[in-house]
């Protein structure tokens, strides 16, 4: 699986950036 990994990493890396 790779799509799920990208989705999780994207969200985790976007969460703190959207602060």
Curated annotation (Swiss-Prot):
GO terms for biological process: response to antibiotic. Keywords: Antibiotic resistance, Leader peptide, Plasmid. The keyword S-adenosyl-L-methionine does not apply. InterPro entries: 23S_rRNA_methylase_reg, Leader_Erm. This peptide is involved in the control mechanism of the synthesis of the erythromycin resistance protein. This is 23S rRNA methylase leader peptide. It comes from Staphylococcus aureus. The gene is ermC.
């Amino acid at each position: 699986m790779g799509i799920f990994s990208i989705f999780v990493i994207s969200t985790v890396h976007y969460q703190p950036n959207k602060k």
